[in-house]
């Protein structure tokens, strides 16, 4: 039984095999045509580069590619694990989307406090999924300031948490190493999606 909101921020150490993490990092580094400066959603629901808020390089994983399929498998493994902890989480009319891979460079990269759900295009986001693709010995934590919780980047670890306003978080600057992560979101289907099905 979940009694406190911080219990919905769940870590799964070593959930994803090292080989998969290495494969994702290799895909990111060799497919530079997909790399862009990290973007954020602004008040107009547009995605823009705002270096005061986020400094990272990220790639959106293309649909119908082997990497997309691998990310989908990782999302299912992650959510299945989450359902063992959060038994009442929804399982119907939900889907995974917005797969991305990013790097926060050593001593440079960060993402200021934010939430992952806003009015507009991200309103259907339910849970965030972060896969840590490498170890960062110093810095680079995902920090939930209002919950007094820091999550250390460790290769193969998955972090899941709700996207709503109760879960503001930020990415600390990695000190010892660059930080590679893959991210995705579990979304509710929109009314339009439900009407079409």
Question: PLM ranges: what are they?
Answer:
Residues 113, 124-125, 138-197:
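Catalytic core of Fe(II)/2-oxoglutarate
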Residues 91, 106, 119-122, 176:
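Short, glycine/small-residue-enriched coil/turn segments at secondary-structure junctions
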Residues 27-28, 71-79, 126-133, 184-190, ...:
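Short, Φ-rich (hydrophobic/aromatic) sequence segments
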Residues 1-93:
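Non-heme Fe(II)/2-oxoglutarate
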Residues 101-104, 119-138, 186:
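Short, conserved beta-strand element in jelly-roll/cupin
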Residues 89-93, 97-105:
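Acidic, glycine-rich loop-and-strand cores that form catalytic or ligand-binding grooves
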Residues 110-118:
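Histidine-centered catalytic micro-motifs
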């Amino acid at each position: 039984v979940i009694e406190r909101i911080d219990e919905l921020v769940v870590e799964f150490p070593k959930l994803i095999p090292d080989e998969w993490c290495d494969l994702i990092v290799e895909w990111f580094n060799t497919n530079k045509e997909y790399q862009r400066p990290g973007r954020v959603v602004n008040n107009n629901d547009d995605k823009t580069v705002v270096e005061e808020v986020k400094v990272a390089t990220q790639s959106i994983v293309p649909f119908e590619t082997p990497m997309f399929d691998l990310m989908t498998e990782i999302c299912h493994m992650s959510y299945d694990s989450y359902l063992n902890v959060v038994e009442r989480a929804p399982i119907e009319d939900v889907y995974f989307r917005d797969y991305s891979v990013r790097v926060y460079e050593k001593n440079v990269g960060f993402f200021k406090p934010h939430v992952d759900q806003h009015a507009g295009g991200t309103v259907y986001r339910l849970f965030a999924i972060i896969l840590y693709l490498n170890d960062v010995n110093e810095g680079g934590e995902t920090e939930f300031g209002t919950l007094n919780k820091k999550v250390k980047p460790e290769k193969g670890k998955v972090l899941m948490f709700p996207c709503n306003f109760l879960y503001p978080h930020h990415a600390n600057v990695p000190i010892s190493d660059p930080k590679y992560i893959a991210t995705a979101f579990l979304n509710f289907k929109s009314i339009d999606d439900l009407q079409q099905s």
